[in-house]
Amino acid sequence: EFGVSDEESLWLEKSKSELPNYAFLVEDLLEQGYELIPITSPNYPRTLKNNLKKTYAPTLIYTKGNKQLLQENSIAIVGSRQAGGDSLSFTDVIAKQAVYNKKIIVSGYAKGVDKQALDSAIKYGGKSIVVLPQGITTFSSGFKSLYKEIISGRVLVLSVFHPKASWNAGLAMARNPIIYGMASEIFVAESDSKGGTW
């Protein structure tokens, strides 16, 4: 009647039956201080929507921290997890300049360049957006180490994955376009030929 295939009909039925579970999950997330920002919200990052367009921009993001950071001018510093000293020094210099120019630093919280970018942003009194390769509720150790920065409004943590999704390499690769999409400028400190930077 509505031009829906049998497969789509089954999917709709399954989705309908799972709605109560998602309602409880959303309520639980809100009680824990997380925010859910759909692509239709004015709080959704404009840069992400403009860079990835509606075709690729995630329809929903999960955040914790100062959501005003989502609308500020930002740069991304990306590179190898096994970055050498020169690359980490380069990252530190770029981060320092970004803080001076009042730009947000977007990073992925991986070791190497990502972690250096975040640490330098904090060291120089700047602000940062951390884009997770996992669900936002599985980042408990990270929330503990960044507690002071999150509370003070200097760091926002963001995920586009199911809130309970554990880290895996596939999510780490899928996270990278979000980092690029969040930034107006991208600096590559070091990239391995077999790595996941690109």
Question: Where is each model-derived feature located?
Answer:
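Glycine-biased, small-residue-rich flexible motifs in mid-sequence functional cores and linkers
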Residues: E31-Q32, I39-W198
